[in-house]
């Protein structure tokens, strides 16, 4: 007796094999994937290319000829989206850099994140430079990091010597310079943080 799936036992048609159910990869399907991704996420051109190539490889497996044909379609689509302005690496990098500072990421970590997303070195450097004076942006990011992690003036409990070393280590792991970390940790309260930030302008 052949095993029946729950769908077949319920009287519903059986499940089709994945190969039969999969639509052929053509320009319309790749564009649908790209638009669905861009509706949900901001993306650089290289990141969108990687996302689409992963989907193609997942769908086609080891069919090298079909994968190459799909890559050509992806390249054409990315070039068209860049020309139309739908993909703008400079704007993507600038927005991601601003959000990074607001979330407490160091400028080094922001630059590394942009490189990981496929943003070119020129666009990444311009985005970091657009944040203004590097020291002020780094200090603002360090203050946001301290607030998110409850360090320095945002800590809940009195500080022991071992805790101070641990807090300095947290700043170092996040990519902040020691003098910036010490300046933030030296603040007694949020008013001191505001004074520190206004003094850096």
Where are these regions (language model features)?
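An alpha-helical, amphipathic repeat domain used for nucleic-acid recognition
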Residues: 1-201
